Amino acid sequence: MNYQAVIGLEVHVQLKTDTKIFCGCSTTFGASPNSQTCPVCLGMPGVLPVLNKKVVEFAIRAGLATNCRIAPRSVFARKNYFYPDLPKGYQISQYELPICQNGHLDIEVDGQVKRIGITRIHMEEDAGKLVHADVPGLGSGSGVDLNRACTPLLEIVSEPDIRSADEAVAYLRKLHQIVVYLGICDGNMEEGSFRCDANVSVMPVGSTTFGTRTETKNVNSFRFVKQAIEHEIERQIELIEEGGKVVQETRLFDPNTGETRSMRGKEEAHDYRYFPDPDLVPLVISNDWVEDTRLSLPELPDARRSRYRSELGLSDYDAEVLTATREMAEYFENCLAAGAPAKGAANWVMGEVTRALNEAGKDIAECPVAPARLTALLQLIEKGTISGKIAKTVFDEMWQSDKAPEAIVEEKGLVQVSDTGAIEKIIDEIMAANMGQVEEFRGGKEKVFGFFVGQVMRASKGKANPAVVNELLMKKLKG
C-alpha cells in the first residue's frame, strides 16, 4: 500500500524587542543565568503583567505579511502545565481568540506553486531553559535559567496542507525570510529565535481520514526539519505495515542519529485547561492601527522579485539572489537610485561584492564600498574609461582604502587605452613574434584568436579596450 504524509508546522518566532512581553526585563541573549529577571517573569505572588505594545505591533506586521485577518478583539489565556522552567505554573498565551487568523503562504517546490494555509498566529511568552551541565557554584547537574522566561514569541500554526519534507522546508524558509525582512525576528536558529514543531501523520493515498499524528518538538535548522520529517514518515509507515499502531505522542529529534525518539504522551488542548487570563484585559485593535501598520511594511520578497523581473528585466535567478535578504535588496536598489544600470549592478552585487563580503566574513550592511561608490565604478566601465577586468582591481583597492574609483584610476594610471595606433603597434609586435599561430588562424583554427586577445591584454597590462582589440585583431589576422 502507498501512503501519503500529512504535515502541519507550528513555528515559534522570538520577537526582536528590547524588553519582554509582560515586564521591562532585557531580552539580550547570552547573559549570565537568571540575571535578566524580575518578580513578574519569576511568577512571584501579587505581580501583574503589563503588555508590551511593540509585541502587538510585530504580531500585526506578521499577520499582514502572511495574508491573515487581524482580529479587532483578541484575548490572552492561561495555558496550565507544570515544568521546572515555567515558574508561574502556567504560560500566558492565546487560545480561542488569537490576534491573527486565516492566512496563507504560497511556496514553490519543483517548479509547482502550492498554497499553504495558516490557521492562526498568536502571541505568547516563552518559558525558561533547563541547563544540563556543570552549573557554576553547584557542580554537575541540572539548573534552571529563567532569563528566557517571558520573552515574547509568536506561534505561527499552519494548516495540515504540507505533504512532504521538501514542502515543509520551502514553507519554513519562506516564513523565515518574511519575519527577518519585517525586522521582527533576527532569525538566528542556533539561538532558538526561529524554531519549529512538526506534526506528522500518514494515511493511505486517496484517503480523506488523517492518521494519528506525532509532534516532533523544537527543531532548529532547515536540515534537521527535513531529516526529522523524513524519518518520522518512514517510521510510521514501517510501524503500520508491521501491524502496529502509531501512538499520539511528543517526540524529540536526535541530530546525531538523524532519528526521532519518544519524549512523552501528546497532550490534547483540554489537558491544558485554558481560560482567559484575568490579569489582562481583552486586546482591542483599531482598523486605523492595522492600516498604519500596513503602510509601514517593507516591500516583501515576492513583490520585489516580481518587480525585478517585470520592470528591470532581471532573470528569475538574479531576482531570487538579490532578494535573499532585505539588506542585499536595499544595497542593490541604492545602486539603482545612484544611477547604476540594473543588470550591471546585479552582476557586481552578486559577484564581486558578495565575493569580498564572504572573504571578509561580513554582512552586506557592513560593506565598506557604498552603493554610490560602486555605481561610480560601473559608470567608469560604461564610459569606456576602464575595462571590466581593471574595474575588479579598482574595486579591491576601494574595499581596502575607501578611495573613490576615479581617484584610484588616476593615481594608478589605469585609464583604458582606446587609441587604435597604440593598440595596432602592440598587435603587430605580437603577430611578428607568433607567426606559427598566425598561420594556424588563417588555416581555419579560429580558437587561436583567444590566444592573441590574451597576449594583447597582457602586453597592455589590461588597459587596452577589449572591443577595439577584437576589431583590430580580426582585421589584421585575416590579412
Swiss-Prot record:
Give yes or no: UniProt keyword ATP-binding.
yes
SUPFAM superfamilies given for it? GatB/YqeY motif, Glutamine synthetase/guanido kinase
- The answer, when asked if NAD is one of the entry's keywords, is no
Class in the EC hierarchy, top level: ligase
Catalytic activity reads: L-glutamyl-tRNA(Gln) + L-glutamine + ATP + H2O = L-glutaminyl-tRNA(Gln) + L-glutamate + ADP + phosphate + H(+); L-aspartyl-tRNA(Asn) + L-glutamine + ATP + H2O = L-asparaginyl-tRNA(Asn) + L-glutamate + ADP + phosphate + 2 H(+)
Question: What one GO molecular function would you report for this record?
Answer: ATP binding
InterPro entries, per database record: Asn/Gln-tRNA_amidoTrfase_suB/E, Asn/Gln-tRNA_Trfase_suB/E_cat, Asn/Gln_amidotransferase, Asn/Gln_tRNA_amidoTrase-B-like, GatB, GatB_C_1, GatB_Yqey_C_2, Gln-tRNA_amidoTrfase_suB_CS
Entry function:
Allows the formation of correctly charged Asn-tRNA(Asn) or Gln-tRNA(Gln) through the transamidation of misacylated Asp-tRNA(Asn) or Glu-tRNA(Gln) in organisms which lack either or both of asparaginyl-tRNA or glutaminyl-tRNA synthetases. The reaction takes place in the presence of glutamine and ATP through an activated phospho-Asp-tRNA(Asn) or phospho-Glu-tRNA(Gln).
Known partners and oligomeric status: Heterotrimer of A, B and C subunits.
| HAMAP family for the chain | GatB (MF_00121)
Q: What is this protein called?
A: Aspartyl/glutamyl-tRNA(Asn/Gln) amidotransferase subunit B
